[in-house]
Curated annotation (Swiss-Prot):
UniProt-recorded name of the protein: Phosphatidylserine decarboxylase proenzyme
Quaternary structure (record): Heterodimer of a large membrane-associated beta subunit and a small pyruvoyl-containing alpha subunit.
Location of the active site: D96, H152, S250
Membrane topology: Peripheral membrane protein
Annotated GO CC locations: plasma membrane
Domain of life: Bacteria
Family that this chain belongs to: Belongs to the phosphatidylserine decarboxylase family. PSD-B subfamily. Prokaryotic type I sub-subfamily.
Binding note for cofactor: Binds 1 pyruvoyl group covalently per subunit.
Compartment(s) where it occurs, according to its Swiss-Prot or TrEMBL record: Cell membrane
Organism: Acinetobacter baumannii (strain ACICU)
Amino acid sequence: MSFTSRLKKELFIKAQNLVPQHQLSRVVGKVAASENPILKAAVIHAFKTKYGIDLSIAEQGNALKYKSFNDFFTRALKDGVRLVDENPDSIVSPADGAISQIGKITAGEVFQAKGQSFSVEKLIGDPQLAQPFQEGEFATVYLSPRDYHRVHMPFSGTLTETLYVPGELFSVNQVTAENVPGLFARNERMVCLFDTELGRMAVVLVGAMIVAGIETVATGKVKPSGRIELQHHELKLEKGAELGRFYLGSTAIILFEKDKIEWEKRFKAESVVVMGERMGHTI
């Protein structure tokens, strides 16, 4: 790596700590939620142009029909665009995106990037709720700005708890994953815990800088409170059912208990996945 590249990376990481993360995200959130026709049209057009958004696969193909940028960003897809693997033993991708990391949880640590990891206990935010996953399996899926931003069930189960864990709002990308210790266990997140025929399963929706919000089917849009909030539920959700959505995106992490599943060998860091695609199978 050249000196210039290294310097840019170091400055970017330092800036993460200097920027008022939550205040900036709130401002962006207000703009994203605005229904002002001129403002929302301008923002949607700029975003669509920059990221090459393909609206031909969206349920609503006319960008002007969305009531706000948030509405556009969390757009539904046409029926049949994403097919959920129907094999009863399959574990499917919860979202469109790229695999950041995938593999085993070793000694309670989840691999983040070269030289970086974080504890599953810190990720979950509760030692007792984290216990079943200590030596289990994980997959981290990063949703880029151009991706479909709804998160779906990787396997059928009953939602039993949601745990909102307050935190920081670092940007999520390869640079921060490699240079911010415990990135995913430090950022604000919503932990969703399930009972399944395989035992316990978790889907963690991780926020990031300028992410305007996280929403789940059980809690609605999360209102940051600055404190850990645990809620109990009894909600059955089938594989492929919508679980939640990101307003300006980030990362979904799925966790399973030890010796319950195996990941498909073709998947590795940076592999592209789409929602419903088979990522693994039960043992």
